[in-house]
């Protein structure tokens, strides 16, 4: 140990956290740090492009918006997957998305857009249903 205290580090400092083999930090994306699948960098770029007067966009704002988008997407896909499973189909179609969104009250109020090739929800008036049920009961009693 010539001329110093402790171990000689060969001119490199060992301060901070190291995760690589050679002691260097491994780069990690904002999405990986936040534990998200959606790209935080791309969302931040879109936020910067769509703000007026060249406003600044914080990194945490982009992460928050990305997390919200990921959550809503996961929620819709889960409901659409359930709708596809109920119909015994393995592929999610726009019809399944329509059934999922219109079936959930909160998503229905949030997403008021028209879904292409989504069709319409089946709706039968209650008055008509009651008459049909009464006829079935009458036939069952007669038989």
Curated annotation (Swiss-Prot):
UniProt biased composition (Gly residues): 1-18
Entry-linked InterPro entries? Histone-fold (IPR009072), Histone_H2A (IPR002119), Histone_H2A/H2B/H3 (IPR007125), Histone_H2A_C (IPR032454)
Describe PTMs of this protein.
Acetylated once deposited into chromatin.
Chief localization: nucleus
Q: Which GO terms describe its cellular component?
A: euchromatin; nucleosome; nucleus
Region annotation (Disordered) maps to 1-34
Q: Where is the signal peptide?
A: none
**Which SUPFAM superfamilies does this one have?**
Histone-fold
- Gene Ontology molecular function: chromatin DNA binding; identical protein binding; protein heterodimerization activity; RNA polymerase II cis-regulatory region sequence-specific DNA binding; structural constituent of chromatin
Q: How does it assemble?
A: The nucleosome is a histone octamer containing two molecules each of H2A, H2B, H3 and H4 assembled in one H3-H4 heterotetramer and two H2A-H2B heterodimers. The octamer wraps approximately 147 bp of DNA. H2A or its variant H2A.Z forms a heterodimer with H2B. H2A.Z associates with the VPS72/SWC2 subunit of the SWR1 chromatin remodeling complex. Also interacts with RBP1/DNA-directed RNA polymerase II largest subunit.
Protein name as catalogued: Histone H2A.Z
List the source organism: Chaetomium globosum (strain ATCC 6205 / CBS 148.51 / DSM 1962 / NBRC 6347 / NRRL 1970)
Q: In the UniProt record, what gene is named as encoding this protein?
A: HTZ1
């Amino acid at each position: 140990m010539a001329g110093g205290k402790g171990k000689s580090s060969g001119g490199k400092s060992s301060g901070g956290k190291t995760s690589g083999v050679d002691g260097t930090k491994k780069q990690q994306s904002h999405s990986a740090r936040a534990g998200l699948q959606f790209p935080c960098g791309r969302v931040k770029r879109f936020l910067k492009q769509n703000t007026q007067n060249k406003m600044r966009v914080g990194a945490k704002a982009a992460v928050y918006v990305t997390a919200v988008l990921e959550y809503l997407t996961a929620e819709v896909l889960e409901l659409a997957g359930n709708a596809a499973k109920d119909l015994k189909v393995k592929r999610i179609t726009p019809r399944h998305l329509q059934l999922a969104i219109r079936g959930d009250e909160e998503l229905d109020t949030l997403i008021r857009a028209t879904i292409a090739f989504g069709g319409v929800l089946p709706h039968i008036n209650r008055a008509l249903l009651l008459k049909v049920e009464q006829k079935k009961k009458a036939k069952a009693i007669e038989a």
